[in-house]
């Protein structure tokens, strides 16, 4: 069915049937959309985020639709919490086939490089870079024990160019691109594929917060997107689902734009 934004809700095809997939940042936005989509595509999903209530609602929804879902508490700024979340997946299912490292935090104060606070930089480093480094290593360790797997990291269109409005956010996302590509090369021999996606403007709570801090940003993003609209979270999740699936078996080390042409 085509909705008012001209997006298409495709019928599931079993893209992830039989796979166990961890999703971070799963309580809202792209992560919540991925939880629903991956489960419909046949994956057993483990959802991780700080908001236990939001995760519980999504788990209930997925199970009501006949899917397999569990939740685990996760604080991306806490390395022990990140490792514990990955360990919990192995406890629940005995393996980990795919990981969608999607959790992130927006920059508290959008603005020029010279006004970005130390606190903002520290938070961006801990959540948008170090957490992924920690998660990827923990995930790869489990995957090696079971013959391999696939990892997808959510970066941003803002990582691909100068970003005066969100300098700390963009810098950490660009660093994430680097370790994504490095992990792809380093772990290929273990049967682990590692890719990233770089979404453009997407209709999420993070964009809502940015709009509140900088009125007019949604209109500017929309105007700069050749397809003429913001992405829906599910559209970003669709790209991640394909990269996690066996249909992307020869794809590793890629940073895939999902931006409506804005980065072209």
Predicted regions and their residues:
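Conserved glycine-rich cofactor-binding loop
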Residues: 20, 27-29
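The beta1-alpha1 cofactor-binding region of Rossmann-like NAD(H)/NADP(H)-dependent oxidoreductases
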Residues: 53, 73-85, 118
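Conserved mid-core segment of classical short-chain dehydrogenase/reductases
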Residues: 83, 106-122, 145, 165-168, ...
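Catalytic Tyr-X3-Lys loop
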Residues: 114-134, 148, 152, 176, ...
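C-terminal substrate-recognition "lid" of short-chain dehydrogenase/reductases
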Residues: 133, 229-258, 263
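Active-site helix of classical SDR
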Residues: 136, 172, 180
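Alpha-helical segment proximal to the catalytic Tyr-Lys
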Residues: 141, 185-189, 249
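Residue(s) in the substrate-gating loop at a strand-loop-helix junction
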Residues: 156
């Amino acid at each position: 069915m085509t909705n008012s934004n001209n997006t298409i809700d495709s019928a599931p095809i079993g893209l992830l049937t039989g796979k166990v997939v961890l999703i971070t940042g799963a309580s809202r936005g792209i992560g919540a959309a991925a939880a629903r989509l991956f489960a419909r595509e046949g994956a057993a999903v483990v959802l991780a985020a700080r908001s236990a209530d939001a995760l519980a609602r999504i788990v209930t929804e997925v199970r009501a639709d006949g899917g397999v879902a569990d939740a685990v508490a996760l604080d991306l700024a806490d390395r022990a919490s990140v490792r514990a979340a990955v360990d919990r997946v192995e406890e629940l299912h005995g393996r980990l086939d795919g990981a969608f490292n999607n959790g992130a935090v927006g920059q508290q104060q959008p603005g020029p490089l010279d006004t970005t606070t130390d606190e903002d930089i520290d938070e961006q480093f801990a959540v948008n870079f170090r957490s992924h480094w920690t998660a990827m290593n923990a995930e790869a360790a489990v995957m090696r024990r079971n013959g391999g797997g696939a990892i997808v990291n959510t970066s941003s269109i803002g990582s691909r160019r100068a970003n005066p409005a969100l300098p700390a956010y963009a810098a950490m996302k660009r660093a994430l691109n680097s370790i994504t590509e490095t992990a792809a090369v380093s772990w290929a021999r273990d049967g682990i594929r590692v890719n990233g996606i770089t979404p453009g403007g997407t209709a999420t709570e993070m964009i809502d917060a940015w709009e509140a801090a900088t009125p007019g940003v949604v209109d500017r993003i929309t105007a700069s997107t050749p397809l003429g609209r913001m992405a829906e979270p599910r559209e970003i999740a669709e790209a991640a689902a394909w990269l996690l699936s066996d249909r992307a078996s020869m794809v590793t080390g890629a940073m895939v734009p999902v931006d409506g042409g804005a980065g072209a």
